[in-house]
Amino acid sequence: MTTPVVQARGIVKRYGHVTAIDHSDFELRAGEVLAVIGDNGAGKSSIVKAICGATTPDEGEILIEGKPVRFNSPIEAREMGIEIVYQNLALSPALSIADNMFTGREIRKEGWQGKYLRMLDKPAMEKFARDKLTELGLMTVQSIKQPVETLSGGQRQGVAVARAAAFATKFIIMDEPTAALGVKESRKVLELIQDVRARGIPIILISHNMPHVFEVADRIHIHRLGKRLCTIDPKDYTMSDAVAFMTGAKEPPAEDAA
């Protein structure tokens, strides 16, 4: 069997007397979109935060491509090729599209200007950003130099996704990527997710939107009471089944139980 891109075993995270993650397991396979669903307070965001370094587990281990890792911050995870598209997008409204694409990893000019004056190579950054947006069919903006605050909600989401796809070498985490978007903009984001998957980049998708989950996910990780309840194939179950598993109204089949 192919080694999972990321695997978590027996993860525990406590906040005082509250156990947010209770000996939970997790697995993301190569080239897939894995949706993570669960009721509010189920711990789905907590397990993903543990994987990307936003929190440090109290117990358990995390393996990236079969090798144990321990991230102390999301920056360390990013350096290993793990990108995150946050629900709030983490974009700087006043900065240009190109500047947002390169926040924290700007390209400096060659020679003394870059070495001593730390001058940025704006043309190189703008070309890279333009190329990446074009690859994903997102060059509907007027200019790569325009501030992000002038973009629509869907276009901003596209910039965040393009940034993640441009630099991810392991996988991408997307937190509620269609939240607060209209029908047309949501459709574009779903197409982007499928496009990124087609490029071979696996995705962890956290979402409450069941129709969207069932449309793009290859597998669905159902989280309940701080741990993985089961992982199901959306082709074999209905949205009603998933909600019933998630809320405890229905027991998952024995062969799918984690």
Q: Where do the model's predicted regions map?
A:
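Glycine-rich phosphate-binding loops of nucleotide-dependent enzymes
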Residues: 2-258
